[in-house]
């Protein structure tokens, strides 16, 4: 990398060094916008065209479409489709008279987004291409690290959810199926006695099931007296795991 590019990226380097994978995308793009050509806005776009973060030149639009993009938080589908076909850092023009520089963002050997520099009066040179290429590589690494952590967290939640379900008896699993069928969203108020009557089970089965899942840390359960029982799901995978191994309800006599 040239000395000029290194100097222009100093703020960007400082952010990466100080924040690492915890750095905010908006802060990175602000640093990139400072390093970019004059009158240029910078966008971080996912593969579906959604704007993850952006940095605008002096807080104003550098081109006619910036305000629309920022309000909608996405770029037009036709432009995004064109960006996804670009496999290397490319400078082009013609989109509403704007000059654009796009750098593909790759993570885990797959395309995960695009880094886009755009402005009607932007003049992109060799240094800008070097900056865009380096930034796309480092941002791809940051995104990949976060995706890996999310997958690890999801795997851990699945493991905890399955372990919690294994602690339940058959009757308690059926009770929780009835509860989740009635629960709208991830939290709500339930009347255990009514659920027990509808399910043909005793209230104690429901109480025991909730106590076990609360002890496992996958739900929060709190009695509100005559009002019922407040339930909040803490583990986002617990409902999916109940559905994955769902038991059919016994047929009622008559």
What name fits each language-model region?
Residues 214-224:
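A short, conserved structural fragment
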Residues 2-26, 30-31, 35, 119-168:
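Juxtadomain coupling helices with adjacent low-complexity linkers
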Residues 195, 209-216:
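Basic amphipathic alpha-helical segments that dock to polyanions
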Residues 171-179:
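Short alpha-helical "packing" element that flanks the helix-turn-helix/winged-helix DNA-binding module
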Residues 169-170, 191, 224-247:
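Short, cationic-aromatic polyanion-contact patches
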Residues 188-199:
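A short alpha-helical element within helix-turn-helix/winged-helix DNA-binding domains
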Residues 81-146:
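Sensory/regulatory domains in signal-transduction proteins
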């Amino acid at each position: 990398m040239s000395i000029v590019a290194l100097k222009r990226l100093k703020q960007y380097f400082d952010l990466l060094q100080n924040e690492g994978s915890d750095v905010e995308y908006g802060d990175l793009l602000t640093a990139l916008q400072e390093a970019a050509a004059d009158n240029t806005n910078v966008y971080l776009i996912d593969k579906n065209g959604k704007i993850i973060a952006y940095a605008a030149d002096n807080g104003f639009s550098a081109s006619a479409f910036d305000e629309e993009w920022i309000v909608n938080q996405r770029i037009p589908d036709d432009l995004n489709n064109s960006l996804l076909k670009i496999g290397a850092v490319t400078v082009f023009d013609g989109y509403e008279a704007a000059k654009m520089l796009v750098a593909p963002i790759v993570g885990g050997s797959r395309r995960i987004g695009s880094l886009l520099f755009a402005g009607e009066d932007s003049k992109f040179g060799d240094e800008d291409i070097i900056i865009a290429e380096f930034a796309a590589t480092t941002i791809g690494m940051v995104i990949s690290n976060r995706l890996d952590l999310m997958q690890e967290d999801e795997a851990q939640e699945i493991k905890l959810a399955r372990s919690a379900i294994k602690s339940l008896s058959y009757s308690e699993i059926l009770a929780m199926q009835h509860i989740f069928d009635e629960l709208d969203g991830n939290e709500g108020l339930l009347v255990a006695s009514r659920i027990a009557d509808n399910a043909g089970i005793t209230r104690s089965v429901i109480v025991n099931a909730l106590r076990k899942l609360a002890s496992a840390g996958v739900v929060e359960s709190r009695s509100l007296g005559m009002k019922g029982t407040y339930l909040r799901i803490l583990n986002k995978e617990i409902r999916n795991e109940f559905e994955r191994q769902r038991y059919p309800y016994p047929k009622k006599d008559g």
